[in-house]
Amino acid sequence: MKSWDVIVIGSGAGGFAAAVTACCKGLSVLMLEKAPQFGGTSAISGGAVWINDTDQARTQGKSGAADAIKTYLKTIIGEQNYRPDIVDAFVASGREALAFLEKEGAVKYSLRPLSPDYYPDEPGAVDCGRALEVVEYDGRQLGDRFRDLRSPPPGMLLFGGMMVNRVDIQHFLEMRRSLRSLSHCAKLLLRYARDRISHPRGTRLAMGNALIARMATVALRKGMTLWLNVNVLSLVEHQGAVTGVNIECDGQQETLQARCGVVLAAGGFAAGELAARYRPHTREHYSMSPAGNDGAAFRLASALNACEGADLSSNFFWAPVSVLRHADGREERFPHLVTDRAKPGVIAVNQKAERFVNESNSYHHFASAMQSQPENAPCFLICDALAMKRYGLGLARPAPVNNDALIEAGYLHKADSLARLAQQLGLDAQALAGTVARYNRDAAQGEDPQFAKGGNSYNRAMGDPRHQPNACNAPLLKAPFYAITLYTGDLGTSRGLVTSENAQVLNQQRQPIRGLYAVGNDMDSMMAGTYPGPGITLGPALTFGYLSARHMAQQPTPSTGETP
């Protein structure tokens, strides 16, 4: 029987954190991925992490008190769903985990100069100090494994294969007005042109792709084995401990031994049958999770009487999503996170042609509002010609890009008047005119008394700081007018397997199942269906991935009784 010390099921950030840490502790590691490419949701994410009091924050004079972040989390999560053991472990070990992974070269982050928590006016919130940005990475370091790295969706790439980060996006928006930005963009384009001579896409990686590529490079160099296209059929249990897995690969079934433990890091159930059961019913819903995130960990762990998290009012991390339907039947999904909703000259209206939410609040808040009333989903994001020229709208890029193909495909609507736009969208023209007129009167003064768009530091950070008197508000005046349809969507699941502070999966009696761990979206999120800030999934994923491997390295193996 083939054997390793640790078997990791899944290849996202949490799984790689466990794998790298285990390798560094002298343990042998096998990573199993169901898909033909590795990286999971993490590889197509923004890659940011939300961790308190990191070395990066301390260097910039932004050290964070543990009491402050705990107060903030308890306020947002609520007393009933707040788990002090898990929160304490995250707060106490987040900095340690990140520093360890950085020391080993597995991650590299910088402090975002301005990245407010999503509820900046609540007790314990900060405008800077917790959110970290992934430093770009050269994908060529992966060698032949670069082709196995999951690529972001086409809509998140420029020119068919170039990745950009938040800073790059700002430079592209400014390049017609700034020589510095023009120079920055020219260098990116030159690098990309060179890459395409020998690679299927750009090798300058950003965001979640940079995170996973860097972690994979280090893990593989430290001896981790990575298998793709593997289906895990069941867990092997011996004398009350998980000691291996039964798999199917290339039509052959095999049993593999895990001497120290198995880590479930398979990405949750956002793409599986469980999703419909735990999701509010809306007309259409689109997940950004890969198809392989089908709840495999739940199926595997349920056979061992594992405890699942409570069914909350929100079991997902929500986001509004637009969908481009290609002529060949393909669907291209775009999550509306930071590029358009908060910008001046952009509003959202529901089926009654009425605004229903502060458009510049977080994507989780926005999509939650879409689900609050039947008429709010799907909804429409609307802007005027000036906003389109400056910021774009979803997959529609700002000037000088030609977006006619998106209009022909029915993704982007364009009309020379609001009345004609309403007709295209199936809205009441008089109601839409009244909504826009009301918004315009207030926006001209930089105000939004109806929904307070631009009313807090997070809103303004997502807007356009050059636009005054408010970074988020400007009247919609200049024709043509544009619109796209937004559907409810998600970035992954919040509900998962209940664990200990060391990421051990607990059984129904709330006792650890020896040798079984869960991290990432397979772990019941301590956020309990809330979304306090940027990177609140990946921060805990790295932390508890690290803690799971550290715990395994300290335990006697079930087979020998000796500490590895």
Question: Locations of the language-model features?
Answer:
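Extreme N-terminal leader/targeting segments of oxidoreductases
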Residues: 1-6, 24, 213, 531, ...
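N-terminal Rossmann-like FAD-binding beta1-loop-alpha1 element of flavoenzymes
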Residues: 6-31
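Short, well-ordered coil/turn residues at beta-beta hairpins
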Residues: 10, 248, 258-259, 264-266, ...
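Conserved N-terminal/central alpha/beta ligand/cofactor-binding core
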Residues: 34-225, 346-348, 355, 386-388, ...
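An anion/pyrophosphate-binding glycine-rich loop and adjacent beta-alpha core
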Residues: 120, 128, 135-184, 298-302, ...
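Glycine-rich loop(s) and the adjacent beta-strand/alpha-helix scaffold that form part
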Residues: 202-209, 221, 249-327, 538, ...
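A glycine-rich dinucleotide-binding beta-alpha-beta segment and adjacent secondary-structure elements
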Residues: 234, 238-242, 431-526, 530
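Internal hydrophobic alpha-helix adjacent to the cofactor/substrate pocket in enzyme cavities
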Residues: 300-307, 433, 540-559
